[in-house]
């Protein structure tokens, strides 16, 4: 039985400690076997042997408790060493990058401001006149059906486009005017390509009649799109907007399939990016301008960002999913 304590002294972990305990104190252990041998003894020999077994059993249990305490302390120390956090260890600080929408906004502004365009910021809450009527969209005009608008009391509403900023600018300033405006706009729509809040940027140039022609508009738009998208092909299409006449929409060759045809471009090889045109005389009359001409253009910032970042779901810009945002 001396070997039991000697084996116990060589134990180095909890697993070995449990094995030593079962070997000595288990139902089939050494001490259980010794107690079973007592039935074969008689008288003083039995008493002496029983006393000896109890002595060694108590000695083993005492040694076991001491060893158990030592093993637990040792294992705790080793575990704390592994889990220890070295606060002095250098940890590289992650630097943030621009949100795709902010990057797109800044890139657009960087193109137009050196050309003399002044950045104008307008109110998000507008009235019916500045948002609709002054833009050749009088009450009951069928084009208003396209606008799912958030209305307030007293004919107030959340602007559905940034065009009201152009109206305010023309009311407050006199030609020549070169301006861009950008910001949030609101419409009641929510799906893969629409959100209730989205961003637009528009531009306006106004000068004395005859000084601004469609060729000027065409040159500005083509320079901008080549700056923004690189070597893409452009396609001009006639269109209709109540506030411009003539009006056009501009497409670029698909940046995803290189005009081979894909789901994004509906297998046409072209992607619509903006609308533009010469300012309708009805808009100038609503402001009180005479003998002037000008052009205007507008585009969705999310649309441009989706094309440059190759994102299919517009809602990804607003859901703060870092797995998505950190991929840009």
From Swiss-Prot:
One protein family per Pfam = tRNA-synt_2d
**Cofactor(s) needed for function:** Mg(2+)
Binding-site list for Mg(2+): 245
Enzyme class, broadest EC rank: ligase
List localization entries: Cytoplasm
- Gene Ontology BP terms: phenylalanyl-tRNA aminoacylation
Query: Could you name the domain of life of the organism this protein comes from?
Result: Bacteria
Q: Which GO terms describe its molecular function?
A: ATP binding; magnesium ion binding; phenylalanine-tRNA ligase activity; tRNA binding
Please give the GO cellular component terms listed in this UniProt entry: cytoplasm
Q: Which reaction does it catalyse?
A: tRNA(Phe) + L-phenylalanine + ATP = L-phenylalanyl-tRNA(Phe) + AMP + diphosphate + H(+)
InterPro entries linked: aa-tRNA-synth_II (IPR006195), aa-tRNA-synth_II/BPL/LPL (IPR045864), Phe-tRNA-synth_IIc_asu (IPR004529), Phe-tRNA_ligase_II_N (IPR004188), Phe_tRNA_ligase_alpha1_bac (IPR022911), Phenylalanyl-tRNA_Synthase (IPR002319), tRNA-bd_arm (IPR010978)
Q: Enumerate the UniProt keywords alphabetically.
A: Aminoacyl-tRNA synthetase, ATP-binding, Cytoplasm, Ligase, Magnesium, Metal-binding, Nucleotide-binding, Protein biosynthesis
CC cofactor note: Binds 2 magnesium ions per tetramer.
Q: Which CDD domains match?
A: PheRS_alpha_core
Enzyme Commission numbers on file: 6.1.1.20
Q: Which family does it belong to?
A: Belongs to the class-II aminoacyl-tRNA synthetase family. Phe-tRNA synthetase alpha subunit type 1 subfamily.
Subunit structure of this chain's protein: Tetramer of two alpha and two beta subunits.
The protein's name is Phenylalanine--tRNA ligase alpha subunit
The organism's taxonomy opens as: Bacteria, Pseudomonadati, Campylobacterota, Epsilonproteobacteria, Campylobacterales
Task: Point out the gene that encodes the protein.
Answer: pheS
């Amino acid at each position: 039985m001396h070997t039991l304590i000697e084996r116990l002294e060589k134990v180095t972990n909890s697993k070995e400690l449990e094995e030593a305990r079962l070997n000595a104190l288990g139902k089939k252990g050494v001490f259980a076997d010794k107690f079973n041998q007592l039935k074969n003894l008689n008288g003083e020999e039995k008493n002496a042997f029983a006393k000896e077994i109890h002595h060694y059993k108590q000695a083993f249990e005492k040694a076991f408790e001491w060893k158990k305490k030592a093993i637990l302390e040792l294992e705790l120390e080793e575990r704390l060493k592994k889990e220890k956090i070295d606060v002095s260890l250098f940890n590289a600080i992650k630097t943030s990058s621009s949100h795709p929408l902010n990057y797109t906004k800044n890139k657009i502004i960087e193109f137009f401001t050196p050309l003399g365009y002044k950045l104008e910021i307008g109110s998000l809450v507008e009235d019916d006149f500045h948002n609709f009527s002054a833009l050749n969209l009088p009450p009951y005009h069928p084009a208003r059906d396209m606008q799912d608008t958030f209305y307030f009391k007293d004919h107030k509403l959340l602007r559905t486009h940034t065009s009201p900023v152009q109206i305010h600018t023309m009311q407050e300033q006199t030609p020549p005017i070169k301006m861009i405006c950008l910001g949030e706009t609101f419409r009641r729509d929510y799906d893969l390509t629409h959100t209730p809040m989205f961003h637009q940027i528009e531009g306006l140039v106004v000068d004395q009649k005859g000084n601004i022609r469609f060729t000027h508009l065409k040159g500005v738009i083509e320079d901008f799109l080549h700056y923004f998208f690189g070597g893409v092909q452009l396609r001009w299409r006639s269109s209709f907007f109540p506030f411009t006449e003539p009006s056009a929409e501009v497409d670029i060759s698909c940046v995803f399939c290189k005009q081979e045809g894909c789901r994004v471009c509906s297998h046409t090889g072209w992607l619509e990016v903006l609308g533009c045109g010469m300012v309708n005389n009805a808009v100038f009359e609503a402001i009180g301008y005479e003998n002037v001409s000008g052009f205007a253009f507008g585009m969705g910032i999310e649309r441009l960002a989706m094309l440059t970042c190759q994102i299919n779901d517009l809602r990804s810009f607003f859901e703060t999913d870092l797995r998505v945002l950190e991929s840009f």
